[in-house]
Amino acid sequence: AKTVFVLPNNKNIIMAAEQAIPLAKDRQVRVLQTKTIPQGISAMLVFDETQSADDNQMAMMDAAAHVETGSVTFAARDSELDGRPIKQGEIMGMCGSKIKFLGDDIVDIAFKTVDKLFKRGEHALVTLIYGADATEEQAQALENRLSEKYGSDMEISIVDGGQPIYYFLLSVE
């Protein structure tokens, strides 16, 4: 390939990726500033090999910009948020990088997180990417709850991502 697109999918990696560009002497490297895995996936899905690098870059960044990302993970240690104690192992629902929900039920926290991110009329597609420590049954239970609430306003896809640390990565477009 004459042009390589790098999708860091993490805000902490973008600068390092950009600094590595001069090391690629035999091809053009473009770092697209994707900050989350769902943004990167959305960007990849619109790539069209028949288009120019500039057109692809614009389309990919536009796709990434329209993705709201949520995640469901666990507290690695005891801490505190806004005066509320968080216990090690407690389930956390995050909208972007902000902790919004705490609890002990993975599906409930994931439902609340998607519910917070999803806006009728603005969004239509939700992708539930379940990780190594979540089950397909949990993903289906989440899909059922979301379908009950949103019906045909929300198209839902379930993907076995197998990722560590995150029970769910949630993409809202």
Question: What does each model-identified segment do?
Answer:
Residues 1-173:
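N-terminal loops that bind phosphate or other acidic moieties
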